[in-house]
From Swiss-Prot:
Its job: Involved in the regulation of glutamine synthetase GlnA, a key enzyme in the process to assimilate ammonia. When cellular nitrogen levels are high, the C-terminal adenylyl transferase (AT) inactivates GlnA by covalent transfer of an adenylyl group from ATP to specific tyrosine residue of GlnA, thus reducing its activity. Conversely, when nitrogen levels are low, the N-terminal adenylyl removase (AR) activates GlnA by removing the adenylyl group by phosphorolysis, increasing its activity.
Record protein name field: Bifunctional glutamine synthetase adenylyltransferase/adenylyl-removing enzyme
Needed cofactors: Mg(2+)
Name of the gene encoding the protein in the UniProt record: glnE
Taxonomic lineage from the root: Bacteria, Pseudomonadati, Pseudomonadota, Gammaproteobacteria, Alteromonadales
Gene Ontology biological-process entries: regulation of glutamine family amino acid metabolic process
InterPro entries xrefs: GlnE, GlnE_rpt_dom, NT_sf, PII_UdlTrfase/GS_AdlTrfase
Membership in a protein family: Belongs to the GlnE family.
One Gene Ontology molecular-function label: magnesium ion binding
E.C. designation(s): 2.7.7.89, 2.7.7.42
Amino acid sequence: MENMSEQALPHEVNQVAEQHWQRLAEAWPDISEQLTPEQTKELKTIFGLSDFVAEQLCRHPNWIVSLFEGQLSMLARDSFSSELHSILAGANDEEQVKAILRRYRNRQMVRLAWRDFLGYAELNDSLLDLSALAEALIIAARDWLYGQMCQQYGTPCDSEGNPQPLMILGMGKLGGRELNFSSDIDLIFTFPEHGETQGGRRSQDNQQFFIRMGQRLVNLLNQVTVDGFVYRVDMRLRPYGESGPLVVSFSGLEDYYQEQGRDWERYAMVKARALGPWSAYSDELHDMLRPFVYRRYIDFSAIESLRKMKQLITQEVRRRRLTDNIKLGAGGIREVEFVVQSFQLIRGGREPALRQQSLFGAIDTLYKLGQLEYLAVDELKQSYLMLRRVENLLQAIGDQQTQTLPQHLLDWQRLCFALGMAGEAELRTHIESAMAKIHRYFKETVGGQESDEVAEQWTAQLWSLVDDEDAEALLKEHGVEESELWPALKSWRGTVAKRTIGPRGRETLDKLMPWLLQEFIQLPTPTKAFLPVSKVLDQILTRTTYLELLFENPGARQQLVSLCMASPWIGEQLAKFPMLLDELIDPAQLYDTTSLDDYPSELRQYLLRVPEEDMEQQMEALRQFKLSQQLKIAAADVTGVLPVMQVSDHLTFLAEAIIEQVVLQAWQQVSKRHGTPSYLAPEEMGFAVIGYGKAGGLELGYGSDLDLVFLHNYTRDKYPDAQQTNGDRPIDIGHFYLKLAQRILHLFSTRTTSGELYEVDMRLRPSGASGLLVSEIEYFGSYQREEAWTWEHQALVRARFLFGDNRLAARFSELRADVLAMERDKAELAKEVREMRQKMRTHLLKVDEGCFDLKQSPGGIADIEFIAQYLVLANTHDHPELAIWSDNVRIFEVLSELELLPHLSAQHLTQAYCYLRDESHRLTLQQAPGQLPQESVDLHVQRVLAIYEQVLNNGQ
């Protein structure tokens, strides 16, 4: 390849080169005597092109001579591993290892960036070098750490005494040996067999050994020091993501993928590769994963899965307003990967040659198998190479993980110089041409049908009319009798005319409105649909991409109109959060409500698209996931697709999945700063979240807040040797849990562009608002037994463990059962429950005349809940099974089975309770007050009041 240093630098680039050169001259005064004129010119050229190279060489000028003495030529990739192992052999502690790894990484990255910018290397060689370097750094760190830990804890062995290694799966581009310049690395840690360590002072379970090792290995690579980092390590692709153990055995891995593996995990596994020297364990691992990834039959279902994944990416691009993104945009790098991997997933079960991690290898195989024509292969490869070259150079400018084209002239000039282009316009033309070719093949292979623009309609004429008589005549001619539509449309159009939309937005609106009007006029009351839809349009007039989304997707238009008609609440959600319009594109997917058990894995997949270290985007993603899933539940609810009995179940399971991720994120953020409590074993948190009220009773509604209590299991008496966390900034363990609780509440309550996640109410904790934010679990138990009021025991009936350590779950269950089973005077208990109910009614009941408040009116939801709570508190001493459930419906079932409540009474209470809750959901979606006409509920109310009288006034 041509040496680009012989070309003259553009003016702006040359200025930057001179600035860096001055810095180097200060660090190395006799530089001019050490270098030839040609070397000086070349060094100045690379200084102008890459701030990263200049920064590193100004810090380490001694590298320059060795680079010119032969390091800039092609090096054998195998040498990375042997060099690193040799250097690390002399390291005594992890701080030394961190310094060695980072300096080696930076030195090699300088060499590779130099070769890339000045045309010394073909792209494929650069990608192979970058991948080999990453693999060598990971494996050298692993091997050094394994040796240290075996000395410290003994060697992990299987049942026959064979040493067990830590196996590392490299995912994504690392697995495919196609790593880009400044990439994070996705890894999965695993080990072959369970067993124990041998040769240490005390034996330790293999999994605990490898979890400790995995944590330390991530820290060796990930932590930012004065020398930077080695790689940003992302472990979220492991089974169960952040909520799963950091390391699992081969059998644990196999069980997970056989029983719970998702389609997106199949896609991720196509590129999975065991890193390091190949061994029998590597073969075993790949043989085990193969049946999950590659089905024995031709598997066309993979296409739909990839299509959904691409839709998620498109939504993310739109929501984050990512423009000029050569990876995620239409025709970007990801679309080439989708095209190739769709063939691999469909046919890899039948064609062993397709079972490879390399995209280049797979695409050549597709040509040999006749699946792609020569022109398609050539255009895809050349376009992909073009985009990957641009991506690599973009990242090598400042060692930044970016796929977005430059915002500034300087970086455009750097790219154009390295690529031999005259300027931004020429380079943009090449990039746009490459992306257009890729997108064409993507649509043919994966993309599905896209709507075409269709012929002019009479509604287009209506949208452009000014004269009232003409408009009314046109409407009448086409059978639209409603008189309110035209005045509403004309008024709104006048308001829109005053808005600053821009030519593209106005043009798109003019194309969209005739289609929306077609939807309105098919309805009996078009204006009733137009008004809420116009509020949504008001919010997206300046977001042209959303106007285009509605124009290009007939299904989205139909769903927008029908859902706004069915529920003002949904209309308001769409207006407040326009990103939800993405959910309307595919009606089949919109009404395919996530199954209850899948919320955690769906959320995990959703969060994978956001960098783990970007806390702001993580918080935003949590809120967007909640909003989109809530929309799906509401859409299925108002259209009758989801039975009303299941609405609360879905809203509750959704909340639990979010609680899990919030706690994990908070834990990660606090422990990153302070370390973890030193008394904990790896993977333990010593922390639990307890749900009260609707969260505890599996009865959340659309606008429900969360009643939560936080518990931990640490006391100084129990763990006298552990008083602080084990991080760089240690703090008292009690203070750690307080910070964790505060962080959790912050993540819930922070208002981002997508609003607040949930409102959290902590007043049910011991001593209420004056109590500690997080309580030690035994203190919680003693408080409940000795200090809590009856109303707090009533609240405990509806309490349920939501997330945290299993040991705390078991202990909380015991404590709750013990407190509920305390012997109580039934007459005194009934009196206290009645008084509390009356107090609530006095303070909270505000109802219009002739109406019934679903919650607080006599015979309403609160009365039913108090009946259940009284009966549990009065009878659990003799019937412990009453403490099993926290939801009212199952409590009534158990009371009926135990004959503590007549079967007919239990049935009437359940029917009334479900009816009132269903009406509550319906009224929320209609944005109506929680009231019904009194006569509509009389039968249910009379039954409830009769049972209330019998149970609580007679002290049953």
